[in-house]
């Protein structure tokens, strides 16, 4: 899903585009539920601020960007990162403090980024 012109209302009638947005929102929600479970198991160091209920915000803003655009989110940035297309496994590895994470496990949940 490449960025779109927000003035182009025809995308709101494009079923494939809307389906992709919905699938990304479901991905964000599922990711957040799993991250919360891992946090509850004591596998996540530090704290975590989830974006459950805010899936459309991250996915919708990400949909308006191109792959070359940068985005800086708040401490509830999982949805924005996933909406922009950051790899799910790399993000989860980051949250778990693994070297294979987007920031080699040093950023954690609140400092997710992928350059």
Region spans (language model):
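Cofactor-/ligand-binding subdomain signature composed of acidic, glycine-rich
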Residues: 1-45, 67
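Cofactor-binding active-site loop characterized by glycine-rich and histidine/acidic residues
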Residues: 33-37, 43-115
């Amino acid at each position: 899903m490449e960025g779109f012109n927000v003035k182009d209302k025809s995308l709101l009638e494009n079923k494939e585009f809307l389906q992709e947005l919905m699938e990304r929102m479901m991905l964000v929600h599922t990711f957040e539920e799993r991250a919360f479970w891992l946090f509850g198991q004591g596998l996540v160091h530090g704290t975590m601020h989830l974006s459950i209920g805010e899936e459309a915000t991250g996915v919708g803003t990400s949909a308006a960007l191109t792959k070359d655009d940068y985005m800086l989110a708040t401490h509830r940035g999982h949805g924005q990162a996933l909406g922009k297309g950051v790899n799910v496994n790399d993000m989860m590895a980051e949250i778990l403090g693994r070297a294979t994470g987007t920031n080699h496990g040093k950023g954690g949940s609140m400092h997710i980024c992928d350059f």
